[in-house]
């Protein structure tokens, strides 16, 4: 509790789970002097009991995402899923596709499509987002269903450098032929 109060927020992640299963964000509400799980205030006793009840987990320090992501939906971490493939002839990596994953009120604190998050294609040349789709109901969203913020037409900042950086990273893993990356853009890049 002291660490949470000092840092302000942490992600609590269970080992061996995928697709955002069991992930919660722990924050501290300084005005109410109380911890929160997934943005809901709880008592200090409930917080301690929650930690005691879960013994196979780790904490990850929360990162502040780029403001363009907060403008779309600020209650979840919204990542880009990059797929890089190695060309079998040239042995050079290429960005095969990229999507912006966007959380919803159903997925707090994560953006996973398998939990009801949205997925918008990113134009590989321009870095501009398409409309978003929900894998659960196949609905199409030009604006975020919870925040009302535009999705379609939004420019991913620093797109060209981001693509270049992904290829540099992929080249550092020469034994890989297919890599799926989940990237969080921050103000620093």
Give the ranges of each region predicted by the language model.
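A long amphipathic alpha-helix within ATP-dependent nucleotide-binding catalytic cores
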Residues: 53-75, 84-90, 95-186
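Active-site nucleotide/adenylate-binding loops and adjacent lid/helix of ATP-dependent enzymes
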Residues: 1-76, 80, 85, 89
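Short, intrinsically disordered, charge-balanced linker/junction segments flanking boundaries
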Residues: 1, 188-189
């Amino acid at each position: 509790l002291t660490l949470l109060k000092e840092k302000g927020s942490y992600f609590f992640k269970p080992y061996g789970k995928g697709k955002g299963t069991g992930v919660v964000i722990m924050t501290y509400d300084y005005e109410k002097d109380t911890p929160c799980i997934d943005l809901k205030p709880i008592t200090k006793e409930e917080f301690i009991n929650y930690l005691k009840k879960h013994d196979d987990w780790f904490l990850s320090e929360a990162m502040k995402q780029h403001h363009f992501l907060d403008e779309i939906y600020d209650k979840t971490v919204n990542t880009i899923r990059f797929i890089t493939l190695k060309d079998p002839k040239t042995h050079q990596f290429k960005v095969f596709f990229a999507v912006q994953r966007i959380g919803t009120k159903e997925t707090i604190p994560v953006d996973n499509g398998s939990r009801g998050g949205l997925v918008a294609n990113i134009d590989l040349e321009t870095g501009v987002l398409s409309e978003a789709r929900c894998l659960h109901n196949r609905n199409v969203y030009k604006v975020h269903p919870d925040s009302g913020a535009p999705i379609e037409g939004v420019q991913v900042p620093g797109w060209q450098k981001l693509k270049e950086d992904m290829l540099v990273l992929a080249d550092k893993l020469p034994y890989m032929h297919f890599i799926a990356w989940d990237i969080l853009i921050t103000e620093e890049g």
